[in-house]
């Protein structure tokens, strides 16, 4: 659970911004989206491999540039 304490003289906007950052860093939304529907393990592994391949290609292109 993500929680944020309000500091003295802190505006609601700043408090909300801090909460959103903590929420995003905690990975709550990412985990929720991941569990929204079932993905077969074989498909999940295939997607992970393709993501890895793309990431490696981008890194390789950046090194060559």
UniProtKB/Swiss-Prot annotation:
Family listed: Belongs to the bacterial ribosomal protein bS21 family.
Gene: rpsU
Gene Ontology molecular functions: structural constituent of ribosome
Gene3D superfamilies: Ribosomal protein S8 (1.20.5.1150)
GO cellular component terms given for this protein: ribonucleoprotein complex; ribosome
Keyword Lipoprotein appears in the UniProt entry: no
Entry keyword annotation includes Ribonucleoprotein: yes
Keywords from the UniProt entry: Ribonucleoprotein, Ribosomal protein
Pfam families: Ribosomal_S21
Protein's recorded name: Small ribosomal subunit protein bS21
GO annotation terms (biological process): translation
InterPro entries linked: Ribosomal_bS21, Ribosomal_bS21_sf
């Amino acid at each position: 659970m993500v929680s944020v304490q309000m500091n003295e003289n802190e505006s609601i906007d700043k408090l909300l911004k801090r909460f959103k950052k903590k929420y995003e860093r905690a990975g709550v939304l990412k985990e929720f989206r991941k569990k929204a529907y079932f993905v077969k393990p074989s498909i999940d592994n295939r997607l992970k491999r393709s993501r890895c391949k793309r990431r490696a290609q981008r890194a390789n292109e950046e090194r060559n540039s």
